[in-house]
């Protein structure tokens, strides 16, 4: 098996066919809707809240609301429906999550997107939840994860998942690799490639994104969407706490399996970090769009499809060369 990660890969340029980078179309169709970018902020409590979800939906970006305030999800779906915006929530697999599905059914509410979000998504509990959602809310687009292997992709798709989310512990706030010895840290991009080759439906590459160019690499190796945590955690709209240390502004960023999120030190596989403050999220999204337009121009096309066929090289150590 060929193993590599984002820092080990460089894409090889093709002849540019557009007059200006601005001609490149970065939009993507996902689940019956078209979004401006193939990126989605991580569904983590320190990355997204209801206010940011509304802003993203209003401005043409995909989002997935986190599941860590379970009592608010029903009202969140109701509010988004009333606003005429896309509704996208996360659920787990415990008994109370089934009750939420029942409440939505009873109220005649179908979220546009439901993401089944647990650390090890290749599980019977996830398959059972897919079956339940598809039986009772058949029009919802179901994303299931997180997973790491082609077998997992095939089984979750066969169960009814409309998309799968790939990545076990490659993110900055995750320490699954250290606590358990398992995961895709260090080979996340190769895992995306393996899973995409097996997939008949879209996949979301989740975790390990350190630079904007990693978005293009994810698309090259088969991702329809790219989930990003740390790069989206430092904005004025980010829910994490603001801190100033030695006159430098930071935002708090913590993993979904961290003691901070759990409220107790039990089965901890995440950590609490500080990330530099980055201002308005709109500026970051604009920069990502511009960089992705440049990527498309290097690929020799005018849309994301051009990225999927470019050649690449694997370098020995890292493309950063000490930078």
Swiss-Prot record:
Gene3D superfamilies found in the cross-reference section: Aldolase class I
BP-aspect Gene Ontology terms: purine nucleotide metabolic process
E.C. number: 1.7.1.7
Single GO term (MF): GMP reductase activity
Signal peptide: none
Reaction(s) catalysed (UniProt annotation): IMP + NH4(+) + NADP(+) = GMP + NADPH + 2 H(+)
Coiled coil residues, start to end: none
One annotated Gene Ontology cellular component of this protein: GMP reductase complex
Keywords: NADP, Oxidoreductase
Annotated NADP(+) binding sites: 203-226
Active-site residues (renumbered): 174 (thioimidate intermediate)
SMART domains reported for this sequence: IMPDH (SM01240)
Role noted for this protein: Catalyzes the irreversible NADPH-dependent deamination of GMP to IMP. It functions in the conversion of nucleobase, nucleoside and nucleotide derivatives of G to A nucleotides, and in maintaining the intracellular balance of A and G nucleotides.
Family membership: Belongs to the IMPDH/GMPR family. GuaC type 2 subfamily.
Name the record gives this protein: GMP reductase
Name of the encoding gene: guaC
């Amino acid at each position: 098996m060929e193993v590599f990660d984002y820092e080990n890969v460089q894409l090889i340029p093709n002849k540019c066919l557009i007059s200006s980078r601005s001609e490149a179309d970065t939009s993507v169709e996902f689940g019956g809707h078209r979004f401006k970018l193939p990126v989605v902020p991580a569904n983590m409590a320190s990355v997204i809240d209801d206010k940011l979800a509304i802003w993203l939906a209003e401005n043409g970006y995909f989002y997935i609301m986190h599941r860590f305030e379970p009592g608010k999800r029903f009202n969140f779906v109701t509010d988004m429906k009333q606003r005429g915006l896309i509704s996208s929530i996360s659920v787990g697999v415990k008994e109370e999550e089934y009750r939420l599905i029942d409440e939505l059914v009873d109220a005649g509410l179908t979220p546009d997107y439901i993401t089944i979000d647990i650390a090890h998504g290749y599980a019977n509990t996830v398959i059972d939840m897919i079956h339940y959602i598809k039986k009772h809310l058949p029009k919802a687009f179901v994303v299931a994860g997180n997973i790491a292997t082609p077998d997992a992709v095939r089984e979750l798709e066969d169960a009814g998942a409309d998309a799968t989310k790939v990545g076990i512990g490659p993110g900055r706030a995750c320490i699954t690799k250290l606590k358990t010895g398992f995961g895709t840290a260090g080979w996340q991009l190769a895992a995306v490639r393996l899973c995409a080759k097996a997939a008949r439906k879209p996949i979301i590459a989740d975790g390990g994104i350190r630079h904007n160019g990693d978005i293009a690499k994810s698309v090259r190796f088969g991702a329809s969407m790219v989930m990003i945590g740390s790069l989206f955690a430092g904005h004025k709209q980010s829910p994490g706490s603001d801190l100033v240390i030695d006159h430098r502004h930071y935002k708090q960023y913590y993993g979904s399996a961290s003691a901070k999120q759990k409220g107790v030190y039990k089965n901890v596989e995440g950590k609490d970090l500080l990330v530099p403050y980055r201002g308005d999220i709109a500026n970051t999204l604009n920069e990502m769009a511009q960089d992705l337009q440049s990527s498309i121009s290097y690929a020799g096309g005018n849309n994301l499809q051009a990225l999927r066929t470019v050649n690449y090289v694997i370098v020995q150590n890292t493309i950063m060369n000490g930078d």
